[in-house]
Swiss-Prot record:
This is Cytochrome b559 subunit alpha. Its main location: membrane. Keywords: Electron transport, Heme, Iron, Membrane, Metal-binding, Photosynthesis, Photosystem II, Thylakoid, Transmembrane, Transmembrane helix, Transport. It is found in: Cellular thylakoid membrane. It is a single-pass membrane protein. It comes from Prochlorococcus marinus (strain MIT 9515). Heme binds at residue 24. Belongs to the PsbE/PsbF family. GO terms for cellular component: photosystem II; plasma membrane-derived thylakoid membrane. Its cofactor is heme b. InterPro entries: PSII_cyt_b559_asu (IPR006217), PSII_cyt_b559_asu_sf (IPR037025), PSII_cyt_b559_N (IPR013081), PSII_cytb559_asu_lum (IPR013082). Heterodimer of an alpha subunit and a beta subunit. PSII is composed of 1 copy each of membrane proteins PsbA, PsbB, PsbC, PsbD, PsbE, PsbF, PsbH, PsbI, PsbJ, PsbK, PsbL, PsbM, PsbT, PsbX, PsbY, Psb30/Ycf12, peripheral proteins PsbO, CyanoQ (PsbQ), PsbU, PsbV and a large number of cofactors. It forms dimeric complexes.
Length: 82
C-alpha cells in the first residue's frame, strides 16, 4: 500500500471490472425507468402536491389571473377563485 493511501481500490480499477458493469447494467436503466414512470403516471404530482398541467386554471378562464394592486393581491385572487 502506498504512503497516503486510504486503502480503497483505485477508481480506474473499479470501472474496468466486470463485476461493476454487471451490477450497473441493471441498476442504471432501472433507476431511469423508475423515474420515467414516476413522472409519466402522475405520481410525482401527487407526491409533491403540485397541480397537474390541466388544472392550473378554471375551464372558463382564458388566461392567467393578473394582480393589479400589490398590497391587495390576496383578496383579488380570492375573488377570482370564488
Amino acid at each position: 500500500m502506498a504512503a497516503g493511501s486510504t486503502g480503497e481500490r483505485p477508481f480506474f480499477e473499479i470501472i474496468t471490472s466486470i463485476r461493476y458493469w454487471i451490477i450497473h447494467a441493471v441498476t442504471l436503466p432501472a433507476i431511469f425507468i423508475a423515474g420515467f414512470l414516476f413522472v409519466y403516471t402522475g405520481l410525482a404530482y401527487d407526491a409533491f402536491g403540485t397541480p397537474r398541467p390541466d388544472s392550473y386554471f378554471q375551464a372558463s378562464e382564458s388566461k392567467a389571473p393578473v394582480v393589479t394592486q400589490r398590497y391587495d393581491a390576496k383578496s383579488q385572487l380570492d375573488l377570482r377563485t370564488k
